[in-house]
């Protein structure tokens, strides 16, 4: 269905995008390890853009890049693919499988029987430079690895798998991440690629990559689709418009801590309780028993996608006792119903953000192994009134799309004009006077993007401004997440509001940001690239931010208006005092009586501020400003009526730019 609300501007944007066409790559697979597994918190990615290089220009990159592989770096499984001879190939690993578990095992040299060492290789989280890291035992020594290093091991295996199939070295890749990954997670994914010996040309949002797999060959006009991506550890929903090779993300939402592993954990907890009821034994703290149970629960979950019940049986489960439980599909759904329902909230959110009604959606595309759960499919069918699309392989679609993006970047002419237009998931801005979140790039803005805005100083002779960069949806920075900060120094002495400080945000196609500030008077500038710092948002915080932004919208607006009114009054007083002392301007054109009247009005206003600035409502502050303006207006009017300002040299009283 054609989007009724698409504008001429959108058409122009697409036309420009085609001229600089860009796309998404796909899969990489590799089985890595059996045993003593280190579960990888894998990153899934956003990233594409309307900007980029056209196919002709991209052809020049073929010799430079070689084959650009596409990797779906998943929480539980990873997959790799490449564009070969005009078609996408999903590459099998050395076990003959097209998807590879995202696990890493650390084993002694020459050890053939890995199972005997499993109990000696548990991992625990430790702190390393203020960030979480993984501690394991390798050859009797304790080793500490960052999440990026462990992810790099999986990426390295994917790289080797592709090289074995292609018969040549691979140096460039497109890697996918969840659409709701924040800046730190995206940067960490790029870092992992670098550690693995890969130049990550593009970080791509998983739903966008999957949309390519779904819509690359569709030529029947514009359509709007929902990509519902429920994997092993993360969940994303994106609403896209597809039109003749242009894939435009209109909105995205999700939860980077929701997926199949959560469903498994619910069942495992239930089975452990049942075992305790029967035997009186608590096996929940025994890692070996819990590990066995988890594997059986995952198998049972898969079975319940096609059968109504299954058995979970483990001989010698704990302290010589066998485990024997029956799990029905109904019980599985009961244990996880709240989580299933939780996945519908982001669906509603993207429809709301994009201004699209659910009956305007042409198709619902299922991605991720957990979308095979019958209850999930039934809920989507009930909500949209149609069967979800099952035309693509949910395990391979993301890698497939990533491989296509890799082909475009490598200059594969068989792909024609494939253009990706993606968005940023959270609003970005800086703190201005009073702790206000001044938004420069709203969420769901098309990336790459660049936005500049002029700010000024908050005090006379202020020679330094602090630029604090935040992400989030609330009106006050204290309720949002600090990404980074830096100072611009050496500002020449001047009255408040006089210097012009230009702050620029640049968000690249990978969703990674650079912020700069420049004094337009001196030309001096400073900048910061927001990277993988501690203190970045957790997935839960991201979800909470969006929810709280709606819940507290009215309250936030009242606080914002109050601070805005306070700034307006303070700026008016400062500006009026400055003009009153200017003998060449207003101060030199007033008689003594009028000047004293204005001075007294200023004194009264300042006294009121000293007493009430912390407690007054926004309306009270606005009233005080109106009273001050009313006292001054008749006096300044006399000057103009008398022709004293005929030259028009006086600047009108104004509030200036937002203050830093």
Swiss-Prot record:
Keywords: ATP-binding, Chaperone, Endoplasmic reticulum, Hydrolase, Nucleotide-binding. It catalyses: ATP + H2O = ADP + phosphate + H(+). Interacts with the ER co-chaperonne DNJ1. It is found in: Endoplasmic reticulum lumen. Residues 404-504 are annotated as: Substrate-binding (SBD). Induction: Expression is increased in the absence of DNJ1. Residues 131-285 are annotated as: Nucleotide-binding (NBD). It comes from Mycosarcoma maydis. ATP binds at residues 74-77, 232-234, 298-305, 369-372. CDD domains: ASKHA_NBD_HSP70_BiP. This is Endoplasmic reticulum chaperone BIP1. Signal peptide: none annotated. Its EC number is 3.6.4.10. One of its GO terms (biological process) is ERAD pathway. Belongs to the heat shock protein 70 family. PANTHER family: HEAT SHOCK PROTEIN 70KDA. One of its GO terms (cellular component) is endoplasmic reticulum chaperone complex. Probably plays a role in facilitating the assembly of multimeric protein complexes inside the ER. Is required for secretory polypeptide translocation. The keyword Nucleotide-binding applies. NCBIfam families: PRK00290.1. A motif (Prevents secretion from ER) lies at residues 657-660. GO terms for molecular function: ATP binding; ATP hydrolysis activity; ATP-dependent protein folding chaperone; heat shock protein binding; protein folding chaperone. The keyword ATP-binding applies. Pfam families: HSP70.
